[in-house]
Amino acid sequence: MSRRQTCSLLLIAFGLFYLVPLSNHGLWIPDETRYAQISQAMLLGGDWVSPHFLGLRYFEKPVAGYWMIALGQAVFGENLFGVRIASVVATALSVLLAYLLARRLWRDPRTSLACALLYASFGLIAGQSGYANLDPQFTFWVNLSLVALWHALDAGSRRARLLGWTLLGLACGMGFLTKGFLAWLLPVLVALPYMLWQRRWRELLGYGALAVLAALLVCLPWALAVHAREADYWRFFFWHEHIRRFAGEDAQHSRPWWFYLPLLAVACLPWSGLLPSALRQAWHERRQAPVVFLALWLLLPLAFFSLSRGKLPTYIMPCLLPLALLMGHALVQRLRLGNSVALRGNGLLNLGLALLALAALAYLQLRKPVYQEEPFELFLVLLVIGAWAAAGLAQWRYPLRAWAAPLLASWVLIALLPAAMPNHVVQNKTPDLFVAEHLDELTGARHLLSNDLGAASALAWRLRRSDVTLYDTRGELKYGLSYPEHSQRSVPLADIRQWLWRARQDGSIAVLLRINSASDRYQLALLPGDGERYRNGNLVLAILPQVRP
């Protein structure tokens, strides 16, 4: 197949598996609705400096990630595609970086293509590409900073070296504006030991200053602007989002230190069967500069994230590009040698996983059906399992010819699985679809009320309003609600009837509740019985009409 044909086929696959599904399912709570609403508020209100969630100060992240999601909504509309396109673009650019870095390291087109394809089809990378959060963007900036570092170190001229270090600084600056100080730390974790090993520490000190200057030029305008606007921003952001998450006893998402070790194997499905051979080859080539650089990039950030108390699966996404390159390099070496053992093992692993998933689905359907009168969704999930099994079987039977079969498994999974979710999951996790069904009833509401931040942000995004009052909930908006001018934005349970009576004299109220517990049912019971009510799964929408004093 010619290069032009390969590129055309990959572009078609990108459109079919990555772009088309973006509009086929609602926004998942809590992340997608949160980021959609924050960026929409920037777009509508014009405040590009201070992030606000539901109109309240929200200082958990800087602003660049919101800017990119807002840009997507500005260009493509305030819709599902517009909210998610930033993640797809960031992922596509990271795939391109994988290709370019592999080409620079090994100067072999086949290896470059294999590395890019593996990275694009890693389960964690592909799955996050259609999900509106900040991790794909942050991962791209970290990837760009370290690719720029290698280009600077491998440059043949002073001009190219200056360009590489400058690009490194710009990428660190944008990464900082996306997710914070980690964007500076991760490149240092790799650059410092690598350049000490190469005995190039003077170069690190000299050119590193240029990278720091470039990063400051990117960061300082916003950093000073937000400090002038919100004097408490940096205190909260540094201590709450960095120190507390890393070392605090009450850190969010606390996990054991080994949490990421098995997760790393899961993250690179459907290629996990190649991990042992790739790591073994990396060990044999441990004195080669490219392998040392990639190993440091993989292992040191992984060790840092493992030491942190707070852990989420997506935190290790910056570690996956070097892993894809090590695996792609080992894969092509085995293809050239005609060694099919690792490929057969990977195919057998995927086939076994597909059969296990099929058996689990059959068991659940017989004992406690996951899908109830949902033949289309059940068909889609069977199609996903079938594609995974077919890819595994093909790679097991014809490992040297069908080595790329897992691509199909991964891409069918990300394209179809969101649409294959059971109705009870969709109803519970994508409340914006329920809101969209009742826009006519909601449009005239004077007040909005919700007992759940995910549902509240879905309501705000669909209605293009930030003024949702919180019903007996605070969550991650505890800090924003602590400001005196916003204390009325949250109504405790004891005051709800009085608040409803006063608010209804001013106009109608739309109340969106998620009912997941006895306390939620009690919240529902406290609402007046008049007006209209609509229910979908565990979501209840009540339209309470205006009353006269």
From Swiss-Prot:
Gene Ontology MF, one: mannosyltransferase activity
Protein name: Undecaprenyl phosphate-alpha-4-amino-4-deoxy-L-arabinose arabinosyl transferase
Similarity comment text for this entry: Belongs to the glycosyltransferase 83 family.
Membrane topology per record: Multi-pass membrane protein
Catalytically driven reaction(s): 4-amino-4-deoxy-alpha-L-arabinopyranosyl di-trans,octa-cis-undecaprenyl phosphate + lipid IVA = lipid IIA + di-trans,octa-cis-undecaprenyl phosphate
Keywords for the protein's UniProt record, in alphabetical order: Cell inner membrane, Cell membrane, Glycosyltransferase, Lipid A biosynthesis, Lipid biosynthesis, Lipid metabolism, Lipopolysaccharide biosynthesis, Membrane, Transferase, Transmembrane, Transmembrane helix
UniProt keyword Repressor present: no
Record-listed E.C. numbers: 2.4.2.43
Principal place of residence: membrane
GO BP annotation list: lipid A biosynthetic process; lipopolysaccharide biosynthetic process; protein O-linked glycosylation; response to iron(III) ion
Pfam family for this entry, one: PMT
GO cellular component, one term: plasma membrane
InterPro entries in UniProt: ArnT_tfrase, Glyco_trans_39/83, LipidA_mod_glycosyltrf_83
Listed transmembrane segments: 9-29, 80-100, 112-132, 136-156, 176-196, 204-224, 256-276, 288-308, 312-332, 346-366, 376-396, 402-422
Pathway membership: Lipopolysaccharide metabolism; 4-amino-4-deoxy-beta-L-arabinose-lipid A biosynthesis
Localisation: Cell inner membrane
Function according to Swiss-Prot or TrEMBL: Catalyzes the transfer of the L-Ara4N moiety of the glycolipid undecaprenyl phosphate-alpha-L-Ara4N to lipid A. The modified arabinose is attached to lipid A and is required for resistance to polymyxin and cationic antimicrobial peptides.
